[in-house]
Amino acid sequence: MFDAMGYAPILVINEKPETLDSVPSMMCAARMMTTDEIIRQPLPVVALIEIGMSIDPLLRQFVKMLGGRLAKLYLGNILNIDIETPIFYPGMFFTHHVIEKIDTIWVSPHYGQHAEYASFLNHVTPPSDLTRMIAPYVWDPCFLTRDFTEFPRWKPRAAPEDDVIVIMEPNISFQKCCFVPLMAIERWYRNGNRSWKGKVIVVNGDRVTDTTHFKNTIAPYLDICKDGLVTCKDRMDILSVMKEYPSALFMMHQVNNEYNYMTMELMWCGFPAVHNTDAWAQFGYSYTGNNIDLAAKQLEIAYSGHTNRLEAYKANANILTWQHSPYNPANQLAWDNLIHARG
C-alpha cells in the first residue's frame, strides 16, 4: 500500500537472512534493513510505524532526530491480552509495550475500544475524537495465495467425504472459541438433520475437547459428539484446510475480533462462511453475537443453497475486497492523513 502511495517502505528486521530460500516469495522484493544499517546511512524518514513488538529505543531516537513521527499501531486485542496474560501465563514476558517517545497511537477498527487504554498506557494524550486514532483495515489476497502462486477455490460436494463443516477458531481465548459454532451445528443437527453423516472438523480442538470440563459437562449432552461426528485436528493454516477440505462449509464466531481476515479469505475463495461480523453482515451468511438459533438457520441456508448462490457470493466478495483494498484511493487517503496528522 505504501509503495502504491509513493513512499519507500522499509521493513526493519533484527538480522538479515543468509539466503532468501526461507523468505516467502512475496517478501523477497521488500526493502529490509537492520537498525545498524539505518543508523549508518541516514535516510529521510516520514514515520516509523511499530506493529506488534516494540522497536529498539535507539532507532526511535534516531528517527526523531531525522524529523520523523513515531506511531504505534496495535492490531491486537491489547486490553484483553494484558489482562489474560498474567492470569493464564504468569511466566510469559514479551515486549508488547515499551513506553518512550511515541507521538501517536493507532488501532485497527475492530479494536477501537482499546484506543484510549493504549494512549494512556503509552503516555500519549488521546484526541477528543477517538475515531481519529482508527487506522483503516486493509487486506489483499496476495498473502493467502502466496503472491498469486496458488488459487484455492471452493467446489460443490460431489462425494460423501466432501460433506464437512470446519470450525477454525484456535481456542486460545474467549475471543476465538469453538463453543458457539458447536452449539449452532448441534441446533441444526437436532432441527431435522439427524440423518446427516458428514464430519465436524474442529481445528486445534484438543485444547477444548481434552479438558475434563468439556468431557464431563458439555460433550455428553451434544448429539453431534455422542454420534461420533466431531473430529479434532491440530492447528492448521487456512490454505492447508482449504486444500484438504475443498468443499467445506465454515462456522465462525469471534468476540471483539470483528475484522477477522479469515472471513475475507474464505469469501474471496468462494467458501461458505457463517460468521458474526456485524460490519460485514451483508456479506456471506451472517448472524449476530451469540445467537445460536440464527446461526443454525444461516448454516442451513449455506448448506442447502450455496452452490446456487456461488456466482453472486463471489461478486459480493469482490466488492468487500475492494472496500478494504490497499489500492483503494479512499483507504490510501485515510492512511496518508494519519501519517501526516491531518484531519
Describe each model-derived feature in a short phrase.
Residues 83-84, 88-152, 326-337:
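A short, active-site helix/loop in glycosyltransferases that binds the activated sugar's phosphate group
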Residues 35-38, 205-269:
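Donor nucleotide-activated moiety binding/catalytic core segment of transferases
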Residues 5, 114, 118, 122-232:
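Conserved catalytic-core segment of nucleotide-activated headgroup transferases in glycan assembly
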Residues 1-104, 110-116, 232-238:
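Extended catalytic core of nucleotide-activated donor transferases of GT-like folds
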